């Protein structure tokens, strides 16, 4: 796929109603752009933040779903907390129609990292209560969004279409009170456990700490980290290879890059990013040591090193096209 085609796809993702690039266009001498000029424009546009209105709509639709659940879940015996997680709160999303994750955090119990802090023991069944919460969410969504598509995955309930302008991923969970949350009294240290309805297991993570650390990384790199993540996600999206790396793991992979490798000069940042990915795939032992920002797992637990190699190939091809390596 050439950069004229990639630019068109990128534009349609960012502003689907705005058609600037056409594959059918007959280029005149004035219109003609060289491949390197198109590659430069591709990088510039890929790193840009999406229009604010796009993000606002994602939250508006998330709040619509949240309000229905908030009003009706008490009828089923639940008064949960609601929070957002994922690439939209991190501001690393690349699609105008980005979906948004809505956490529905049960009020029946909390998991405490340090059992010595438990004062009133919970006598119910966490798995049963979370199963009931999930079932209630599904019922409420079906009743309120009769023409929407509802897809039930093991960890989330995806609702889209109908009157909704965005896909909303409803994620049942419970609070996980870490020792750091108690010691430092900072909300972002409070974690969650996401419920898997198939295995009945609960999986710990710290989405608010992740958002905080992404903010910090971007600040420490003078605002270059988020644009680089957007570029990497865009390269994955437009790749002719099927790159099996989640948005979360792309963030994590680049989070592990040393801050000294980020430069105001985008070309230098691309050079060092390409070099970083090359060294990563050449050193499997080093790759095995890389962890996600919140420290809950190694990247390699979910991402095969060959997928990282595919991402490296995209950066290498782009850097070569730009004539910087």
PLM feature spans:
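Residue-level recognition of the N-termini of beta-strands and the immediately preceding loop/turn
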Residues: 79-81, 155-157, 250, 288-291
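Catalytic cores of NTP-dependent nucleotidyl/adenyl transfer enzymes across multiple folds
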Residues: 59, 63, 124-283, 316, ...
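Terminal (often C-terminal) interaction modules
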Residues: 3-40, 285-325
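Long, contiguous hydrophobic alpha-helical segments, chiefly transmembrane helices and signal peptides
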Residues: 62, 85-88, 100-104, 249-254
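A short acidic/basic microdomain associated with nuclease active sites
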Residues: 79-90, 146-151, 158
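N-terminal regions immediately upstream of nucleotidyltransferase
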Residues: 1-83, 89-97, 109-126
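Amphipathic alpha-helical interaction surfaces
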Residues: 71, 75, 106, 238, ...
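Histidine-centered divalent-metal-coordination microenvironment in nucleic-acid enzymes
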Residues: 87-107, 158-173
